[in-house]
Every structure is written in C-alpha cells, then in structure tokens.
C-alpha cells in the first residue's frame, strides 16, 4: 500500500479539542487558534499513518509530504473497502 521509507520526523497539528490532552504528553507549540503542533520521530510511514488516523479529524499531518500522501492513500483504500 505504501513504502516503509520515510523522513526522520513528522509534524502533526492537533485540534483545539484535544490540544490540552496532547500537550500533557508531548512537547510542542500552541497556535493562535488553540491547536497544538508536535514534531514526532518517524522511523516508518506505516506507524505515522496509524498514529495520525487514530485521532480522526482531530489530527492533521503537516509534514513530510510522503506521510500526507500515504494517509490519503490509506483513506482511499478505506473508502473503496466501504463501497
């Protein structure tokens, strides 16, 4: 489905709805809208996809572009499986 190769880091924006919970567990920066941005280590795109998707619409991968593409691909596969 997607390659295991990736960058060493991913940047994820968490929604204001879960920002406080994430901030209690991770180092990052708040944005003006209340969202929270974290740079996570990323050894494998598959892990990154699973990590971001577990938060549904409350998380957005900002980088690397390969991760964003892999998430889109995973979502297309899910949509096709659901008919």
What are these regions (language model features)?
Residues 1-83:
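Polybasic (Lys/Arg-rich)
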